[in-house]
Each structure stands twice: as C-alpha cells, then as structure tokens.
Design a protein with these regions (language model features):
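RNase H-like, metal-dependent nuclease domains and their acidic two-metal-ion catalytic environment used
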Residues: 1-98, 105-109, 121, 125, ...
Length: 221
C-alpha cells in the first residue's frame, strides 16, 4: 500500500530506498521509502507483501512519479530479481557501484546496495547521525516504531523486532542523498513513439498534478 505525505515538486530531487522480501503471505514485507533530498522529508512510503518481480513495477511508477528519483535496491537475495526487472523496464536512474577489477584491470559495475558486515553498520550509523542531527523529517508512525525496536547485539548484529524493512529502506534512501542531486531544469519527455502519448501530453508539463502511474513508460517502443 502506498502512503503519500507530499506530492512531487518540479524543482525537488528525491531518493528511493527499496528493501525486498520474497512476497509470501506469512513472510517479511517489502518496503519503498521516498525522501526529499534537500529537505530530508519522508514524502512517501510503499509497504506490503508482493513478489520481487512485481515490486519492480511499483518502484518504477513511484520513481518516475517523483521525477526519476535515484533508486537504490538492496541487492541481496530477492533484490536481484527486482533490480533485473527494473533494468528491463528501463528505469533511468538506478544506483550502481563502480569498482576496478584488479585481475582484468577493467571497471565493473554492480547495481543496488549489497548489505554486508561492513556496509550495513555504515548505512545504519549514517541514518543514526541524520536522525540525531535532525536532518530527516519522518511522518510514518510505523517507521518510527521500527526505529525504536532496532538494536545492535553484543556480536554487532543489527535488526528490529519483529520487522525492520522500513528501517532498512529508510537507511538506503538516506544513503542515496550523498549521490543524488537537485535538478536545475526539468527535462521534457519525448512522447512521439509511445502508445499513450495523448494521455500524457497534458499532465507532463505539471508533475505536481500527476497521478501515480501516469508517467509509466512500460509501453515505450
């Protein structure tokens, strides 16, 4: 289910943090957090149980609605399925990490955020600092509730009880604020070769009045 506190603004930049799950009726939840880069506002959240490939469509529509927001999907486990589907849909602004392969001496890239023993503490510590310094404005009570139960044990393992999907998605969205930018101009979309160009001509000039899914490009030839 999608909850929106603030609709997209033309001159604002946004980030998406995506925590994925298997999508079973009795399992963990998937979550998408949307943050305003400049103001640190939590502007929207999607939360529910859905297969990872279908989650990609939700992420795509939310991301496009928020001006092609910088999207970061956790690449562990089921997240790879979501990433592959997003790439097939042609989402234009996915986070990717570039690194130099010492053996081939070539640059390689990996889409998404891989949560490891090293990267998870970094991400959570950055989130903690942002909250402590009041850089983030949260509206979701359930997100705040998960933050209150999120702990680190003696072995250094971090988790929430019973769930922490909202926290992890928020941490990724906050991490992306380092790499996102606030647009200096709004690029117009060429609708010439899309099957639904006529439906998108009017709202395309005013994204604040767009309804979610209006700018879906799944029909692009």
């Amino acid at each position: 289910m999608l909850t929106v506190w603030e609709r997209p603004k033309r001159w604002s930049g946004y980030t998406l943090g995506v925590d994925t799950a298997e999508g079973l009726g009795h399992g963990d939840y998937s979550c998408v957090q949307v943050i305003d880069v400049k103001e640190g506002k939590q502007v929207a959240i999607w939360h529910g149980r859905i297969p990872p490939d279908e989650l990609a469509y939700e992420v795509y529509n939310i991301g496009v609605w928020y001006g092609n927001a910088l999207c970061c999907v956790e690449s562990n486990n089921h997240g790879l399925t979501t990433i592959v589907q997003l790439r097939q849909l042609g989402y234009p602004n996915m986070f990717r990490k570039r690194s130099l392969n010492n053996e081939s001496n070539k640059m390689t890239q990996e889409f998404g955020w891989k949560t490891t023993r090293t990267s998870k503490p970094l991400m959570i510590d950055d989130l903690g600092m942002a909250l402590k310094n009041e850089e983030l404005i949260l509206h979701c009570r359930d997100t705040i509730g998960e933050l209150r139960t999120f702990t680190r044990n003696e072995r250094g393992s971090m988790s929430g009880s019973p769930y922490d999907d909202r926290v992890m998605a928020l941490a990724m969205a906050n991490q992306m604020r380092k790499y996102a930018f606030i647009p200096e101009f709004v690029q117009k979309v060429d609708d010439t070769f899309t099957f639904d160009w006529w439906r998108r001509q009017i709202p395309s000039n005013d994204p604040e009045n767009n309804h979610i899914g209006t700018n879906s490009f799944r029909g692009t030839a």
